[in-house]
Amino acid sequence: MIQHEEIATPIGLTARLLDVAEVFAGVGVSREETVVRPGERLPVIGVRDLQDGAVAPREALDTVGFSSLSKAMTYAVQADDVLVTGRGTLLKFGLVGDETAGAIASANIIVVRPGTDVTGGALFAILSSDVFRPKIEVLRRGATTLLSLSPKDLAKLEINLPPLNEQQRIAALVKDAQIAYRTALEAAEIRRSLARRLIDARLFGDNQNH
């Protein structure tokens, strides 16, 4: 239940994350269960599925069997959700797109679901920023390099939220930046593959397949 204890400012409002978003951890599943667990198989998001601010699409995710579909769907992510790694060596963030919506968040993932008059793109920009990231880092606990983050601790952090129209501009910039980044990566991969073929042709000629 999202509460509303906000402090209005000329540039927006200051509020705890729990006042403007729903914050919860995903469902517990082990790697072994991705193979042997019975029930209807659903795509599950793990730590490795968060890369460069994006979340892997449903078809690229491991699937896990769930005996109770209704229970599993309470952990399904929605477009515009912000995902944060709750356990792992690295603190990672991801913004859920339509291609991932409906997948199930694992227990290693914290879901931050924006409330009314809040955009996920703006929340993602705030939480993953170089300014705010250290505030989350200090909340992570662990005796080794495998650190954990509590959803309750994360939810208590205060954020400065811009007005909605500015949030929408920020969200658009985030989306454009992610599209540009993915496009650049795809183009680089194509160039590398082409260069490899040309190099192999010069080195081995027609003998490269023999």
Residue ranges, per PLM feature:
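A short glycine-rich beta-alpha junction/loop motif
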Residues: A103-N108, R141-Q168
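A structural connector/turn signal
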Residues: K71-A72, E99, T144
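Generic structural signal for buried aliphatic residues
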Residues: D81-V84
